[in-house]
UniProtKB/Swiss-Prot annotation:
GO terms for molecular function: GTP binding; GTP cyclohydrolase I activity; zinc ion binding. It is an enzyme of class 3 (hydrolase). The lineage of its organism: Bacteria, Pseudomonadati, Spirochaetota, Spirochaetia, Leptospirales. PROSITE patterns: GTP_CYCLOHYDROL_1_1 (PS00859), GTP_CYCLOHYDROL_1_2 (PS00860). Toroid-shaped homodecamer, composed of two pentamers of five dimers. One of its GO terms (cellular component) is cytoplasm. This is GTP cyclohydrolase 1. Belongs to the GTP cyclohydrolase I family. Keywords: GTP-binding, Hydrolase, Metal-binding, Nucleotide-binding, One-carbon metabolism, Zinc.
Length: 183
């Protein structure tokens, strides 16, 4: 990868041997290794057995999870917030595992639509809950810095499974909670 970065620098008219760029290929490789590390992560290892028998029936929501990913079309970042909820079916998950699941899929080349679904289906697979809801709101630098240059635009995506898809009351409760944050 480092050699390819040197070639990119040359192709845009830069001198990869100048002081400020000498270590750039190494830094870019290290950054991309981290930003795409989700390809090499097994969700079961992320969850690490942190699933517990519990009779609670109320909605469990982790709000405002920071999301940083790379658009697969331009390799530019998009960033925002994810809200992930589930209705338990006699099992709950350690709350830190939800943001970790988000990170696994965000640390890949992505489109936000697929990212939203991958998170929802991963939670569904791990917990087998009565339902899962994921909403992501993000800003895409590929749309802000280039192309249409719309700096204030945001993309909202959602994936609703089970009770969140089938039951309007459950869906409304989720949407109210992510809008206001109040109970």
């Amino acid at each position: 990868m480092e050699e390819n970065i040197v070639n990119i620098l040359k192709s845009i008219g830069e001198d990869p041997t100048r002081e400020g760029l000498l270590n750039t290929p190494k830094r870019v490789k290290k950054a991309y290794d981290f930003l795409t590390s989700g390809y090499h992560v097994d969700i079961t290892k992320v969850v690490n057995g942190a699933i517990f028998e519990e009779s609670t029936e109320g909605m469990i929501l982790v709000r405002d999870i920071e999301v940083y990913s790379l658009c697969e079309h331009h390799l530019l970042p998009f960033y925002g917030r994810a809200h992930v909820a589930y209705l338990p079916n006699k099992k709950i998950i350690g709350i830190s595992k939800i943001p970790r699941i988000v990170d696994v899929f965000a640390r890949r080349l992505q489109v936000q639509e697929r990212l939203t679904e991958q998170i929802a289906y991963a939670v569904q697979e791990v917990l087998d809950p009565q339902g899962v809801a994921v909403v992501i709101k993000a800003k895409h630098l590929c749309m802000m810095m280039r192309g249409v240059e719309k700096q204030n635009s945001e993309l909202f995506t959602s994936c609703l499974l089970g009770a969140f898809k089938e039951n309007m009351v459950t869906r409304s409760e989720f949407l109210d909670l992510i809008r206001t944050g109040s109970t």
